[in-house]
């Protein structure tokens, strides 16, 4: 099994940078998540952000990617890296959208985001990078079973 190298990327877009201390989240990923490479970006889902991740995959040997940004259901095309294990920490919908935007709630919101980063780092480390089974070949044929009218509607 090849060595794994984990990288964490924290997005500042979509209100994340205004509500959270993203530099502190980068430090949490490095210290508590034990991630050797952690960075933040203004908008991870734009071309520059995706290029930064792809560059690290190509040049730094990153095999596992943890993205702290929006929901794993959003921006799936932007964060599709077929050769790498990818985990998403849902900071937008899971943290800042459900917490009040008040001074009293700011500290607990930050703590919640830090927990999400810790969980994302732990999740991606437990993943196996996709690669298929090297012992079997691939096949382009498909068998459809039960393709009746009920299954088509």
Model-derived regions: residue spans:
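Residues forming the flavin
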Residues: 1-153
